Amino acid sequence: QAMGMILSSRRVGADEGYRMGFVTEVAGVEGLDALVARFAADVLKASPVSIRTSKALVVTGLAQPDMAAAMLAQHGDPAFAAWMASEDAREGPRAFAEKRSPQWKGY
C-alpha cells in the first residue's frame, strides 16, 4: 500500500491512515485537546533522557540504508552511550523490580 501511495501521490484521511497503521489515534475537534493532553501526559511519564535518546536514535536509524545498518548505527550513537551511562537507565528497571513509580533525574 505504501508504494502505491508514494507512486501515485495519493492522499489519505486520518481514518484511513489509522486503519493502515501510520496514524496512532484519531479525534474530532471536540476530542482533540483531551487526546493531546493524554499523549503529553504519557510522554511526561518517561525519562527525559529516554525521550531525547529515542528521538536521536530514530533520526540516526532513518538515515541508514537498511535495518542492520540502522541497528549498528544506533548502538554506536553518542546518545545511546549517554543514555546507557545515565542514572535514569538504572532507575527504570530498578523501579519496575521494586513495583514503584520511577523517580527520573533527567541524567
Regions found by a protein language model. Give the residues of each.
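Short helix- or helix-capping micro-motifs
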Residues: 1-10
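Helix-loop "lid/cap" segments that line or gate small-molecule binding pockets
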Residues: 5-6, 57, 61, 78-84
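Short, glycine/polar-rich helix-capping loops at beta-to-alpha or helix-loop-helix junctions
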Residues: 10-16
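C-terminal long alpha-helix characteristic of the crotonase
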Residues: 14, 23-74, 104-107
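Terminal peptide-recognition signature
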Residues: 17, 54, 96
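Structural motif
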Residues: 20-21, 99
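Interdomain hinge/lid region at the active-site interface
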Residues: 85-89, 95
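Terminal low-complexity tails and localization/encapsulation signals of metabolic enzymes
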Residues: 94-107
